[in-house]
Curated annotation (Swiss-Prot):
Originating species: Solibacter usitatus (strain Ellin6076)
Matching InterPro entries: Chaperonin_Cpn60_CS, Cpn60/GroEL, Cpn60/GroEL/TCP-1, GroEL-like_apical_dom_sf, GROEL-like_equatorial_sf, TCP-1-like_intermed_sf
Family annotation (Pfam families): Cpn60_TCP1
Subcellular location: Cytoplasm
PANTHER family on file: 60 KDA HEAT SHOCK PROTEIN, MITOCHONDRIAL (PTHR45633)
Family per record: Belongs to the chaperonin (HSP60) family.
Protein name as annotated: Chaperonin GroEL
Functional note: Together with its co-chaperonin GroES, plays an essential role in assisting protein folding. The GroEL-GroES system forms a nano-cage that allows encapsulation of the non-native substrate proteins and provides a physical environment optimized to promote and accelerate protein folding.
């Protein structure tokens, strides 16, 4: 297949056309008065969204050269979303502005490599300024960050703040679709894993179909238990103590399961058996977690512990265990707090070291089960389309609040970048690098201009008014159409989101500026279809 090669100014202009098409579609969504974008879907109804990265991911242009430009800016949005969870529209606007001004400078004779160096230096300085503006999250700020990120939906902001309060910053918060029209929060105390009872005969609360064990012993075993004679001495000791028993094992089957069921029905021993969570090495690690949480010794052949030698003091304890057909929840395990703290530190270290996203997610789940708990936000809406859009907003808001807890917050509404640009006014470098600094300074005004433009006001006037005020938190609140202290008004952004948006935008824009040639396939010209019956051409009107 023959390729086309486009050089220098023609290549940069082709990229710019692609960048503009994508950015112009994305930037209408910015701010509290941003508009929606409707996306056609091959299957099902169209999707309506105000999420920048969702819009960016849908865009595929016909011209292969322009499409390359669009895809590179799409990368800015995706990367910012992955790292910070929000700020995708801001990042797209910054990338468009830096690249557009850069192309003009290169066309006027500036050296692209010097421009890129200037841009990189300016971004480094601006990022430091953003960090100086940052304040740690306190009080109602979590709800405010969630509200802003969910496109000014206070209900979502408050639910996320409640969830964070209940499970702590290490807890796992998941988002699910609700069967009702109401968005609500469910929290699970203690450790829960997705394995239910092995026999419905273990149920003690018939109405709720749950087995509830108060103050039970917990036997943790990594292999199958099928032979009764290994288990019998232990069962006799437990029956004498009058306490219930939870068995967690790879499988409990045959006569072992039958004996437990018969004793349960006779009232001799209140027991329940569940399968061990996870698979392979992850199962071993999770059983060790349960052991540490409950103060029990997991029975594993690797460490030379066998079932027949187990005594009562080797078993774990908990205040209460609830088992339904799908889940087991252990509340208030009797493990040593120092041991649990040590395990939490170990898991945090593993999370920092791992390079696999899947492993990180699983480690974070284990950490949450030991440290905080699990909260589930159930998103409800009147229609399927609205629910999908709302669920995406909740997920964005959740990422943004986590980012805020991690690195703090800065004034929102595009003000943090405008204040950071102030430091660039006195920053001096040599030659064409200075043009690069000016490009970043101009780009830092762009998000505020766009927020103002989307709310139907003139951007330049607002930018000047905000810039002149000495108070760093002073800005334009587009939701109420007033000038005020944005932090006090709850218009705040996570520092990580603002910082990531600028860094990723400058990184990709700098690469595009230093492009000198583009290679793409030549689009095939489709041959005209043959004439229809009777010699009429395909476009004959009759």
């Amino acid at each position: 297949m023959a390729k086309q090669i486009v050089y220098s100014e023609a290549s940069r202009q082709a990229i710019l056309r692609g960048v503009n098409q994508l950015a112009d579609a994305v930037k209408v969504t910015l701010g509290p008065k941003g508009r929606n974008v409707v996306l056609e879907k091959k299957f099902g109804g169209p999707t309506i969204t105000k999420d920048g990265v969702t819009v960016a991911k849908e865009i595929e242009l016909k011209d292969p050269l322009e499409n390359m430009g669009a895809q590179m800016v799409r990368e800015v949005a995706s990367k910012t979303s992955d790292v910070a969870g929000d700020g995708t529209t801001t990042a797209t606007i910054l990338a468009q502005s830096i690249y557009r001004e850069g192309v003009k400078a290169v066309a006027a004779g500036a050296n692209p490599m010097a421009l890129k160096r200037g841009i990189d230096k300016a971004v480094e300085l601006a990022t430091e300024e953003v960090k100086k503006l940052s304040k740690p999250v306190s009080g109602d700020m979590i709800a405010q960050v969630g509200t802003i990120s969910a496109n000014s939906d206070k209900t979502i902001g408050n639910i996320i703040a409640d969830a964070m309060k209940k499970v702590g910053k290490d807890g796992v918060i998941t988002v699910e679709e609700s069967k009702t029209m109401v968005t609500e929060l469910d929290t699970v105390e203690g450790m829960q894993f997705d394995r239910g009872y092995l026999s419905p005969y273990f149920v003690s609360d018939a109405e709720r179909m749950e087995a509830v064990l108060e103050d039970p012993y917990i036997l943790i075993h990594e292999k199958k238990i099928s032979n009764m004679k290994d288990l019998l001495p232990l069962l006799e000791q437990i029956a004498r103590s009058g306490k219930p028993l939870l068995i967690i094992a790879e499988e409990v089957e045959g006569e072992a399961l039958a004996t437990l069921v018969v004793n349960k029905l006779r009232g001799t021993l209140n027991a329940c058996a569940v399968k061990a969570p996870g698979f392979g090495d992850r199962r071993k690690a999770m059983l060790e977690d349960i052991g540490i949480l409950t103060g029990g010794k997991p029975i594993m052949e690797d460490i030379g512990v066998k079932l027949e030698g187990v005594r009562l003091e080797d078993l774990g304890r908990a205040k209460r265990v609830t088992v339904d057909k799908d889940n087991t929840t252990i509340v208030d395990g009797a493990g040593n707090p120092k041991g649990i703290e040590g395990r939490i530190k170990q898991l945090r270290a593993q999370i920092d070291e791992t390079t696999s996203d899947y492993d990180r997610e699983k480690l974070q789940e284990r950490l949450a089960k030991l440290a905080g708990g699990v909260a589930v936000i159930k998103v409800g809406a009147a229609t399927e389309t609205e629910m999908k859009e709302k669920k995406a907003r909740v997920e964005d808001a959740l990422h943004a609040t986590r980012a805020a807890v991690e690195e703090g917050i800065v004034p929102g509404g595009g003000v943090a970048l405008l204040r950071a640009a102030k430091a660039l006014a006195t920053f001096k470098v040599d030659g064409d690098e200075q043009i690069g600094v000016s490009i970043v300074k101009r780009a830092c005004e762009e998000p505020l201009r766009q927020i103002v433009s989307n709310s139907g006001t003139e951007g330049a006037i607002v930018v000047d008014k905000v810039r002149e005020n000495a108070n760093n938190n002073y800005g334009y609140n587009a939701a109420t159409d007033t000038y005020e202290d944005l932090v006090a008004a709850g218009v705040i952004d996570p520092t990580k989101v603002t910082r990531s948006a600028l860094q990723h935008a400058a990184s990709i824009a700098g690469l595009m500026l230093t492009t000198e040639a583009m290679i793409a396939e030549i689009p095939e010209k489709k041959s005209a279809p043959a004439g229809g019956p009777g010699g009429h051409g395909p476009e004959m009107d009759y």
